[in-house]
């Protein structure tokens, strides 16, 4: 998986992490309050599985497997390569905040999207990919 050019995401007015707009459904966002991909700590990327317009950038998340590589092009022209260590699907009400955003001793990556069957117009779960820097 290649993350492509990243959108910059911050915090929404309600204090939650921003997500890309529907218009940017085919782009992945980088949560700028976390570290830059490749730096020590968890870098966090967020993208849509789908939107009202149809499939989005992370529509193939179900094909990601442990051991797969994720390539992130950095603003400084270098590339960070991560290897998937774990995939997790959780109810949004039980989001593992400390596991996703907590400090780590090495460069790590989190990729977050929505999952589960649509209920009342929304997907109730988050799918989280955890990966470690390998190059």
PLM regions: where:
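Solvent-exposed, non-transmembrane regions of membrane-associated and secreted proteins
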Residues: 1-65, 74-76, 86-135
